[in-house]
């Protein structure tokens, strides 16, 4: 008790010294908490994927250009045993697009895909169901559904997409709490009756024990883009990239929009170093107060 009283008397006498150390300690801890939250979000990108370590995207390199593509487009010249593939999810990004609801035009970012998308990614169902088998169905995110219909029940409502086709809302899903590489407002059915006129992408989940190094070695051999067209001499290679690395790839798309987000590891390292320095500063301030 006497020690505590002595410390309080000294702290009150050295008010400036005490205030500086207390403010330094509080500021350091506050900044560390903010930075740690940011760092945690960067390291937990796409954790809503069922298994982000085993889901792969296709990276195509052609004559110095790299882009995300689809394996099935070139599968006539790629020798990957079909039995190694567990799930194939094909989707077409429709960024910078729009739809019409109740006579009003709304900008949107959409993915045209099928129900296999939900075998790779887990979303909480808010209303309706997660089903894209009906070619006239659409699934909205919770925030976008509120933007279109407010507090009304969106299930059964009809929207008109930019291609002139009408779609009926079959479900509403919540956006994941974590950060995601793919961001969208709605999911549309990718069926033969819906032609999107944009390049599709594909995600794959392979069976346990699949030799990914061997598959990527196969893809590293240059192949002709159109082997049946003698005049087309373009060559390409491909590689399968784990989904958890797509966010860090920095591989820009030809169309800038809001669907893809990218991470910067160099920037993250700077923030980690800054967090460590701030933590050390806070520890020094605590030691200064403790040794009074």
Language model: regions and residue ranges:
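Short, strongly hydrophobic transmembrane alpha-helices
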Residues: 14-41, 281
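A short amphipathic helical element positioned immediately N-terminal to and/or at the very start
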Residues: 3-14, 78
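Structured, solvent-exposed hinge/loop segments at the ends of secondary-structure elements
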Residues: 32-152, 161-167, 217
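Hydrophobic alpha-helical transmembrane segments
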Residues: 4, 18-19, 270-271
